[in-house]
């Protein structure tokens, strides 16, 4: 696939930066950060424009907090000016992140999403005898910076854009607990960044193509790091799963225990329990829904 260049000029166009401001401010128009930025919007956008063009830009000013729904996650909220930057980049780069994604990956994509993924999965549940569910351990925290930078360089050739991507990527490192907390060098993208959603989706794109084109899996669906594989030959499916596990380990990822069942038994996926001819809320989703009532 031909790499794309000359995008920095489009990213730094004042109309694009203004659009990025409105996207970043959506739902937060009364916050102090938005108000401060808006009061000098022309000056602030010009400053951001010059910082992008010069490469002299500060990123990684995160506010950390935890959420517990449906499980504990560390969220990293970037500063408002940084969120404007993220939107400015993705307003322009979004279609180029889309180009090499397979049809059956459903996260962070216009016209896709959870319910389209469930609908597609239901077809597999009806058509095939076996289903395997794969889930990557601590996916966002395990993304290798060097590998991600290399993958982005296969999509984009603009050196200033790649420098900007790398600066955003290396502004964060995941923290792991091992007796005492310590930083793991060179891994992780922050949950909460708009850019992280695109980076994380792209990180597994080559794996998608490996599964579909080299292994020839009959039907395969991915929603970020949650994957379903379908087939009628259990032995073949087991062999394919071993090869996928090996492929993921090459890019620093490890799977949680794989679930391989007959489709008639059902499988949990994206908060639902899927059967050949019905889809139900799973137990955890039911409890979460009741708490919100």
Residue ranges of predicted features:
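PAPS/PAP-binding and catalytic site of the sulfotransferase fold
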Residues: 88-92, 227, 244, 248
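Conserved polymerase palm-domain catalytic core
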Residues: 44, 51-52, 104, 109, ...
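Short, conserved aromatic-histidine micro-motifs
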Residues: 56-61, 217-221, 289-293
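Short acidic-glycine loop/turn motifs at beta-strand connectors
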Residues: 69-71, 232, 277
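Conserved two-metal-ion catalytic palm core of "right-hand" nucleic acid polymerases
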Residues: 1-157, 172
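Gly/Ser/Thr-rich beta-alpha loop segments that engage phosphate groups in nucleotides
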Residues: 34, 190, 194, 273
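C-terminal polymerase-core module
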Residues: 234-293
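Short acidic (Asp/Glu) and glycine-rich catalytic loops that position anionic groups and cofactors
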Residues: 1, 22-29, 66-68, 181-182, ...
């Amino acid at each position: 696939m031909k790499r794309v260049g000359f995008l920095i000029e489009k990213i730094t166009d004042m109309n694009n930066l203004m659009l990025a401001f409105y996207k970043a401010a959506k739902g937060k128009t009364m916050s102090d950060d938005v108000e401060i930025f808006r009061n000098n919007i022309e000056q602030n956008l010009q400053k951001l424009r010059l910082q992008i063009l010069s490469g002299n830009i500060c990123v990684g000013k995160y506010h950390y907090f935890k959420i517990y729904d449906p499980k504990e996650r560390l969220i990293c909220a970037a500063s408002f000016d940084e969120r404007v930057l993220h939107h400015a980049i993705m307003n322009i780069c979004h279609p180029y992140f889309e180009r090499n994604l397979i049809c059956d990956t459903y996260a962070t994509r216009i016209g896709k999403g959870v319910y389209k993924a469930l609908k597609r999965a239901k077809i597999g549940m009806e058509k095939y005898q076996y289903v395997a569910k794969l889930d990557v351990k601590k996916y966002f925290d395990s993304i290798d910076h060097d590998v991600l930078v290399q993958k982005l360089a296969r999509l984009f050739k603009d050196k200033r854009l790649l420098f900007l991507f790398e600066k955003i990527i290396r502004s964060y490192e995941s923290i792991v607990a091992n007796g005492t907390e310590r930083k793991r060098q060179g891994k992780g993208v922050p949950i909460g960044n708009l850019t992280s959603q695109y980076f994380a989706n792209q990180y597994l794109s080559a794996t998608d193509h490996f599964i579909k084109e080299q292994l020839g899996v009959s039907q395969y669906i991915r929603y970020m790091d949650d994957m379903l594989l379908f087939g009628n030959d259990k032995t073949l499916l087991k062999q394919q799963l071993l090869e996928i596990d090996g492929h993921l380990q090459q890019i620093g990822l490890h799977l949680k225990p794989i679930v391989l069942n007959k489709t008639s038994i059902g499988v949990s996926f994206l908060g639902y329990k899927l059967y050949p001819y019905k889809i139900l809320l799973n137990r955890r989703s039911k409890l979460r829904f009741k708490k919100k009532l």
